[in-house]
């Protein structure tokens, strides 16, 4: 299943690199750092505590710690850029965000390899628990933001979007300390399914898009009320970013919900059981469906 997932992602990555040039260097860098980590490990997980580059930079835990620190620093510099009208501050925030994404994805790839070093029966794609999906959420939200930043040519929204990412990595660090959540654990039987490998990433593309649109809507409301109005993009640009983010998120969330129902039918014998998670997924879906309907049919605009 893992090999099939990796092969299946190749066309998507090729398409991404074709349409978005910065992603090409990012993907190549992730591949180089991941392969370097595998080479340094030499098939021995204990080297994570003895090999210098693994211990301080490239083991999954170290890379994710770097990701977290860099996201927080990026948030600070984006706010400096916004409040002080400093282009250099925002530019530093942008570069730090790119490096954070690089370290985060490298950490996930290395964590995938580390799980197989523990045991072939333990190895799994790292999207199986709260620790791993919070890393994934942070990375997807950051990547989506970087795409829109480049597309619209403005860095002023980084101060808002990076706030929610910093909150996520703050929770991630607390969760690691309080629950020792960074430790790789075997999958419970219900998660030993290939559905997990496509359901979870699709879900978190949706969550990341919704989070981004929520923070852009905060900027929209501030602009509308004259707060930092001269430092933010036009209302039309903010509205367009919100709409596109919600549309992308809704599409992926719909796909993920359908995949989740199919997974539930295979694991528990029923497509829908009205448990709290499923019920709230439906509420979220209906909420965004109503918003998109009002926009497309009634011309609704704004936050």
Question: Predicted segments — roles?
Answer:
Residues 1-50, 59-184, 191, 198-228, ...:
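Hydrophobic cores of alpha-helical transmembrane segments in multi-pass integral membrane proteins
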Residues 232:
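P-loop NTPase nucleotide-binding/switch module
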């Amino acid at each position: 299943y893992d090999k099939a997932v990796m092969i299946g992602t190749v066309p998507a990555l090729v398409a991404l690199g074709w349409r978005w040039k910065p992603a090409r260097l990012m993907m190549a860098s992730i591949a180089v750092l991941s392969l370097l980590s595998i080479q340094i490990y030499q098939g021995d997980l204990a080297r994570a505590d003895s090999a210098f580059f693994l211990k301080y930079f490239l083991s999954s835990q170290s890379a994710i710690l770097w990701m977290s620190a860099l996201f927080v620093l990026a948030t600070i510099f984006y706010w400096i850029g916004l409040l002080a009208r400093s282009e250099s501050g925002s530019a530093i925030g942008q570069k730090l965000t790119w490096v954070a994404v690089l370290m985060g994805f490298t950490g996930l790839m290395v964590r995938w390899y580390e799980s197989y070093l523990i045991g072939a029966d333990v190895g799994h794609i790292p999207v199986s628990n709260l620790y791993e999906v919070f890393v994934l959420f942070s990375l997807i939200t950051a990547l989506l933001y970087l795409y829109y930043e480049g597309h619209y040519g403005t860095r002023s929204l980084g101060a808002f979007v990076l706030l929610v990412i910093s909150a996520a990595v703050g929770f991630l660090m607390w969760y690691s300390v309080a629950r020792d959540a960074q430790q790789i654990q075997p999958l419970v039987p219900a998660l030993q399914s290939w559905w997990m490998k496509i359901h979870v990433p699709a879900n978190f593309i949706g969550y990341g898009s919704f989070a981004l649109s929520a923070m852009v809507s905060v900027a929209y409301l501030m602009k509308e009320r004259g707060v930092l109005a001269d430092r933010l993009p036009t209302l039309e640009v903010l509205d367009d970013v919100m709409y596109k983010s919600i549309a992308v998120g809704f599409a992926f969330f719909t796909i993920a919900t359908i995949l989740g129902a199919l997974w539930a039918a295979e694991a528990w014998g029923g497509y829908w059981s009205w448990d709290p998670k499923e019920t709230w997924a439906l509420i979220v879906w209906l909420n965004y469906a109503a918003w998109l309907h009002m926009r497309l049919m009634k011309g609704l605009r704004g936050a």
